[in-house]
A protein has these predicted regions:
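N-terminal carbohydrate-binding accessory modules
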Residues: 57-135, 277
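Surface-exposed intrinsically disordered loops and tails
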Residues: 57-75, 116-122, 153-161, 194-220, ...
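Carbohydrate-binding surface patches
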Residues: 474-542, 588-594
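C-terminal beta-strand-rich structural cap/linker in extracellular carbohydrate-active enzymes
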Residues: 550-599
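Glycoside hydrolase catalytic-domain groove-lining segments
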Residues: 126, 326-376, 401-409
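Aromatic/acidic polysaccharide-binding cleft in carbohydrate-active enzymes
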Residues: 367-500, 504-506
């Protein structure tokens, strides 16, 4: 989440009130926060894990690898009218490595989502699909120390009791998906909270809002918090391997500290310092960072964190921030402002703060999307071109270092952060890359949105970046080109994005694409994949069937099929290593051309 704190808090209070009123009448609701395994024994010895908690609701069928795209059933769209944009690619020489920073991380709402949600499904298979088809490597989520995970409580004498059973189930799901946790250390267990009433109602998880007050209510609470951090590290290293956790996991302290602290407040520094101390007592080699600031708080928080760390010698390996397409009152899906914001963060890190004490850690945005709140742009084709343009500009600007990761929020509509009690199987405007589906209809599970298909196209790009010229200045057509490291294929990604999400997506620009110095002799095979208003678009298919809130099984099959990528295939014989094509590029559309030798 990432607009102003006041806007978010007021909106969250209103939604929480609606949710509580609607919950009892909602047949799709399941309170996943009350079940689970037994708490462990005294003194931090309990809850060894193993098996699924009692409140698990995994999909009934085993996971299977998704099928590769097939040929489209219709013919490719034909260009008409004058050429509005030209693109030229030099396929003969790489200009550098293609940066896959956008595959580093994706979000999964809150931790319990990977065990169960109010809807009767969990997000584990969505995570598997995200890794298999889009290449995502890390999963980040809120609330690993929330009450619904149940890690921490105390006996009558105040002795800590740890139960790792649900925590294990969460991280096991991440690892089973072929991914790693990007650990967000949040929030405060009720038994350690300094203010039991200080909950963040915007994060309304199964009637359990997390406590965001720091653990400083009693003299020994920082000690207990630090001991919890140390025990946490010791446990996960025993379960997943010390070398693996130390070398490959990230540990991020908190999420959007402005919920608790003002821009000039040193409270977050105390939280960071004490949390990191506890984590590093478990293993001094861990990778630690923060502050995961929203757009408004990021500059001051990052300055404070880097300055404090460098002056005190406190470990800080990376800094994180959040930025959405409509932050600061902008219309949705604004790319240019988000790109400029990343440049400003890099400036803070590399110049403003550093000066004589250079910070060399990673800079990561682990929450981005076309909007900070639910919006229809997240379901339709607008998100697809927004993602493509964002990644292209961030990854190819020679004047600003690309982020180490740029994580989309979030992987699935199995999402409870702003749950209003509706039991609709298709609730438009939600955050996910995939629809939540109907728990009774397997054909409905994890149907892709255009946004997810944009990431699939990005995943199909090669490892070596090629030089590209042309396109339109500012809004409109842009392109990135790559080739496979073994020279077997050349890929060109073309998008047409207009900031604001309000342009007519049925309109198109005729594009002339020329590839020079192709490394193939003889005929070539060209496959064109399209994501736009009329291709790989479950939302437009849903509109066409009358917007049913609970699609039938047959309708879900239609939606699933409409969401799938397909390709148009042609063959050609380049003249002197040059191939040219003319095609229509829809506004808010993305196309990928894959060129290989025909034999």
């Amino acid at each position: 989440m990432a607009r102003s704190f006041v806007d978010r808090e007021l909106f969250g209070l209103a939604l929480a009130a609606l949710a509580i009123a609607a919950c009892a009448k909602d047949p799709g609701y399941k309170n996943a926060g009350t079940g689970g395994g037994q708490l462990g024994g005294l003194g931090g010895t309990g809850g060894g894990g193993g098996g699924q908690p009692a409140d698990s609701c995994a999909d009934p069928q085993p996971w299977s690898e998704p099928a590769a795209p097939a040929a489209c059933a219709d013919t490719a769209p034909a260009a008409s009218g004058a050429v509005g944009a030209t693109i030229a690619v030099d396929a003969g020489a790489a200009v550098g490595a293609w940066n896959r920073f956008y595959e580093k991380a994706v979000a999964v709402d809150h931790a319990h989502t990977l065990i169960c949600t109010n809807y009767g499904r969990n997000a584990a298979n969505a995570l598997r699909k995200a890794h298999a088809q889009a290449g995502f490597q890390y999963a980040r989520f809120h609330g690993i120390f929330n009450e619904d995970i149940g890690v921490y409580r105390e006996d009558a004498s105040g002795v800590p009791i740890y139960d790792w059973s649900r925590l294990d189930a969460v991280y096991d799901a991440v690892v089973a998906a072929g991914m790693r946790p990007f650990v967000e250390v949040s929030f405060t267990p009720n038994a350690l909270a300094s203010d039991p009433s200080q909950v963040q109602k915007l994060l309304w998880y199964n009637q359990i809002s997390p406590n965001i007050s720091p653990p400083t209510g009693a003299a020994d609470d920082w000690g207990k918090w630090g001991a919890l951090m140390t025990a946490f590290v010791q446990h996960i290293e025993e379960r997943y391997g010390a070398d693996e956790v130390r070398a490959s996991w990230y540990f991020e302290v908190w999420n959007e500290p402005s919920w608790m602290y003002g821009p000039g407040d040193g409270g977050y520094w105390e939280l960071y310092k004490n949390t990191v101390t506890g984590l590093l007592q478990g293993d001094p080699g861990l990778r630690v960072g923060g502050p995961a600031g929203s757009a408004g708080e990021t500059p001051s928080m990052i300055r404070m964190l880097i300055t404090g760390a460098l002056n005190s010698g406190t470990k800080l390996d990376f800094v994180t921030y959040h930025r959405y397409g409509d932050d600061n009152g902008l219309p949705v899906a604004d790319v240019k402002d988000a790109v400029a914001f990343h440049a400003s963060v890099q400036d803070i890190v590399n110049t403003t703060v550093a000066k004589n004490m250079k910070f060399t850690g990673e800079v990561i945005n682990n929450e981005f999307g076309p909007s900070w709140m639910p919006d229809i742009s997240r379901d339709n084709e607008v998100a697809a071109s927004y993602i493509a343009k964002m990644i292209h500009l961030l990854g190819t600007d020679p004047t600003v270092p690309a982020p180490a990761a740029y994580g989309y929020w979030a992987v699935s509509d199995l999402y409870e952060e702003i749950y209003t009690g509706t039991a609709s199987a298709y609730r438009p405007g939600n955050y996910g890359l995939m629809l939540k589906g109907d728990p009774k209809i397997p054909e409905s599970f994890d149907v892709a949105k255009p946004s997810f298909n944009a990431f699939r196209l990005l995943h199909m790009l090669g490892d070596q970046q090629l030089g590209v010229t042309g396109g339109t200045a500012g809004d409109g057509v842009g392109a990135a080109a790559t080739r496979s490291s073994d020279g077997s294929a050349v890929q060109v990604l073309v998008y047409n994005h207009v900031d604001g999400g309000a342009a007519d997506s049925s309109a198109a620009i005729t594009v002339s694409l020329t590839l020079n110095n192709l490394p193939f002799t003889g005929p070539i095979r060209v496959r064109q994949y399209i994501v736009d208003r009329g291709h790989a678009n479950s939302y437009r298919a849903w509109l066409a069937m009358g917007q049913p809130p609970r699609p039938t099984q047959a309708q879900w099959v239609t939606l699933r099929d409409a969401a799938e990528l397909c390709y148009y295939e042609t063959t050609a014989t380049p003249a002197g290593g040059t191939w040219t094509a003319t095609f229509p590029q829809s506004i808010y559309g993305v196309a990928l051309f894959e060129i290989r030798a025909a034999n």
